[in-house]
């Protein structure tokens, strides 16, 4: 029998042990974590809609009409008209023929990928894709080939060497780096080599593109270019759940084949009603997005002036690259001492030697909030200097 306690201790010794913070109250920039009020820069609530009044009122109004629980799977008696309205709304929002509502983004990726590929097929996956994509690839039992991050030329070479059914899967916005996939080039090579392109736009929906419709539409691509679009509703949209959007045939096929859709209880229908209201806020949220963009630019300019290493990202995800696990944890603790919550991200979430602080900005933040973060980063800069001083001479 494996010694689980020993494995946990090894994680602690490597600076990889993870703990949960106990949050009280609503998700908003200033929240209560473990009983302490902190200004948070680690939420994915990019537009500040998680506690939006109209969305909560829509939920309250729907509850007496539809009840609380989903009660059954969608293919038994759990597919409520509220779910159906949301799917129609998501199809229109993404400019696609149909959409299918999943309980979580993880379930959407696992269910879609394992339904669209199997033994004898080949999946091509960006090396920095999300864990749910990786697990979907494993579950499919297809052959999996990983291409270097964003390297379309390398992908095209792989595609040219491969026959049979081919699936190319990529994040639209990469969750730990904040950069955007080269979607136009990916669509081109997939068409040229008869490969089905799947884009998980979990971190693009709500933030990028016309009226927040995501990275695919921002790139000027349509359903024909990107046949399979996956998105989540718990980030930019501010509620919960996920979806896949595409052709009528695709959605019908997934209803028949996606096990994570078939064999689970439907999400609460009242939540679907609240999500429809939130999509209205997303579509009318150009001022929110403009404010968010201004905050991103303000943070980047200030952090770079302080000498911090940032990644090339124009999205709300702004990683501060550290490298060493312990140094990342120390900087996170130093910021918390200043009343800020900024999480250290370590392997296996990111590659070895690439630990970082993942700063995420929200339209609910103010300029004063960002300035407070920058002041704390300036005060905590000595943490990095001390780490460099501890490094052994070569």
UniProtKB/Swiss-Prot annotation:
This is 8-amino-7-oxononanoate synthase. The gene is bioF. NCBIfam families: bioF. Substrate binds at residues 18, 130, 349. Its cofactor is pyridoxal 5'-phosphate. Keywords: Biotin biosynthesis, Pyridoxal phosphate, Transferase. Homodimer. InterPro entries: Aminotrans_II_pyridoxalP_BS (IPR001917), Aminotransferase_I/II_large (IPR004839), AON_synthase_class-II (IPR050087), AONS_Archaea/Proteobacteria (IPR004723), AONS_Proteobacteria (IPR022834), PyrdxlP-dep_Trfase (IPR015424), PyrdxlP-dep_Trfase_major (IPR015421), PyrdxlP-dep_Trfase_small (IPR015422).
